[in-house]
Amino acid sequence: MSNERLRDSMLRNGLTPTSISEKIGVDPKTVERWITQDRIPYPKHRHAIAAMVREGESYLWPNAYSAARTAAVAQSEVVTMYPRRSAVPGELWRRLLDNASMQIGILVYGGLFLHELIPDLTATLIKKANEGAQVDVLLGDPNSQHVAQRGADEGIGDSMAAKVRNALKFYEPMRGHDSACVGYHDTILYNSIYRFDDEMLVNTHLYGHHAAHAPVLHLRRLAGGDLFDTYAASFQRVRAKSWEVWPDE
């Protein structure tokens, strides 16, 4: 049985068995066996490869840890929990954004509050993209039934769709940027996800409550844990179904 997750992650990052072997000091044939025979590398090699391909160890080698150990590590991935989004310190949002250098992901319906917290958000996202980070902003399709339903559930009606359209105006400067994608999605959001490299804020959603009044998890990815990776995988699934707001630019 082959490790297709490892193979795909290497291809997406332009890596080969030879290039990886040179970086971590093993024989290329050893790397080949990790792929074709699903052999599990030593912990130090798993950590190095995961960093190279920007994936979690638990995603690349799900059988490397026992269920008990994975559960224990996952608990440590929770840095803290806030009772509501409005309790998350503004400086935390700023720090996470400023420190991110590889991957920034925003999955929301509107997320208009971000531009109030961080007035230079769009300019910072463009700067990060120019420096090599992958930036993905996924907004709810303002014409979708899910956005309409969320507006009804929160008692604000059409205002939810209006929030999406207003948020989109802030992202206009990102039009046509290769590494900064602004897309629409048509999914039911059980959580809004804000990813900054290996840290993440997850705004849970509660029926009948505004997102600002719902709890937030602050997560930090750890080797051997799978909680962060579970939310990261959910983000990627939505991203795969999304479409660009400005596809021809």
What is the role of each PLM region?
Residues 44-59:
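DNA major-groove recognition helix of helix-turn-helix/homeodomain DNA-binding modules
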Residues 1-19, 23:
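A short, Lys/Arg-rich alpha-helix, primarily the initiator
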Residues 141, 146-191:
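HKD-type phospholipase D/PLD-like phosphodiesterase module
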Residues 69-146, 229-237, 244:
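PLD-like (HKD) phosphodiesterase/transphosphatidyltransferase domain
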Residues 180-219:
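HKD (HxKxxxxD) catalytic microenvironment of the phospholipase D
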Residues 25-41, 63:
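Recognition helix of helix-turn-helix/homeodomain-like DNA-binding domains
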Residues 18, 29, 58:
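Key DNA-contact positions within bacterial/archaeal DNA-binding proteins
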